Design a protein with these regions (language model features):
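C-terminal catalytic histidine-bearing segment of alpha/beta-hydrolase fold enzymes
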Residues: 259-306
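Short beta-strand/loop motif that positions the catalytic acidic residue
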Residues: 230, 236-238, 242
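Hydrolase active-site cap/lid region
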Residues: 164-216
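Conserved alpha/beta-hydrolase
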Residues: 103-122
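Short alpha-helix in the alpha/beta-hydrolase fold that links the catalytic acid
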Residues: 232, 246-256
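Alpha/beta-hydrolase active-site loop
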Residues: 126-146
Length: 306
């Protein structure tokens, strides 16, 4: 081997080593930044102690993998169904008190919970994007004890979960998925590109491998494909001005539009952001959006009863 060949080989090996080290380090930094513990958000539009007298609840616990999750059951008299709410990443169950109260007022019992690594639940961190579906699956096992038709409501991280779990064994009457993403890897890839630019594509194989090691087959679940294959009525909502999960990017809405399944209805909400599509800064639920959700749930329950 000539001197030039040896030098070239060393340069290539060094470049490969740098690539491997930087890619692995970048994935670890990303995980640490995104998936640490998520304790109570600093800013809540409504706090439970302010509404406890009007919305009594009981605390429930159940396991999701090795984590013990804490949830709350809000019973409604002569409830027509049980709404299970899956929250977003960095939020917790109490973040969605406006939605919880709305559903109770509409005559539904509601089950909320803090996901793994969040709020009152166990876990050293939230683990990753696929964890939301695993936690919702565990919550549904607890929800089935109430012996009521089950309706799902998920936002963002929970919006993905409310679609992804439809590929499982639980009997779900209908699901509303707001501002969700289609696949964990798709959103991780977009986030990496946002942070690092096009060079982030070099690290995608390591993102994929990390997800496989953490979650196995659960990392590959497409919310859109699971929803389409289930036949369950699904309402997918997304804001046109969502900067967190762009509607025309790795969103559940875009993927569901490609699936074009008859059981899925997609609604793009003009001018709405990642959170404003549900409630405003004062905690008031969007009347127009929740009128659609209420009608959707009522129709699904009527069809199920027929």
């Amino acid at each position: 081997m000539s001197g030039k060949s040896r030098v070239l080989r060393r340069i290539l090996l060094l470049a490969l080593a740098v690539y491997l080290i930087c890619s692995v380090a970048a994935v670890q930094v990303m995980n640490a930044a995104l998936f640490g513990r998520a304790d109570e958000p600093k800013e809540l539009t409504v706090r439970y102690e302010d509404v406890a007298a009007d919305y009594p609840r009981q605390t429930v616990t159940f396991s999701s993998g090795s984590a013990q999750l804490t949830g709350w059951l809000y019973p409604a008299e002569d409830a027509a169904a049980l709404v299970v709410i899956a929250h977003g990443l960095g939020a917790d169950a109490e973040t969605y008190l406006p939605e919880t109260m709305h559903f109770v007022d509409e005559g539904y019992s509601v089950l909320t919970y803090d996901a793994t690594g969040t709020g009152a639940s166990g876990g050293s961190g939230t683990r990753g994007l696929a964890q939301s579906a695993l936690d919702l699956d565990a919550a549904l096992t607890r929800a089935e004890q109430e012996d009521l038709p089950i309706l799902l409501f998920g936002h963002s991280w929970g919006g993905y979960a409310a679609a992804a779990v439809l590929g499982g064994s639980h009997d779900v009457t209908a699901s509303v998925c707001a501002a969700g993403f289609d696949t964990p890897l798709g959103l991780m890839r977009q986030t990496a590109r946002r942070w690092c630019g096009p060079v982030a594509e070099l690290g995608v194989p390591f993102l994929w491998l990390d997800q496989q090691l953490r979650f196995g087959a659960a990392a590959d679940v497409s919310g859109a494909k699971a929803a389409a294959a289930s036949g369950v009525p699904v309402l997918v909502l997304h804001g046109s001005d969502d900067g967190t999960i762009p509607a025309d990017g790795p969103s559940l809405l875009a993927a569901c539009q490609k699936e074009n399944a008859p059981n899925i209805r997609t609604v793009l909400l003009p001018g709405e952001t990642h959170t404003s599509l549900l409630h405003d800064a004062q905690g008031r639920c969007s009347e127009a959006v929740f009128a659609q959700i209420d009608a959707f749930y009522a129709a699904a329950l009527a069809d199920g009863a027929g």
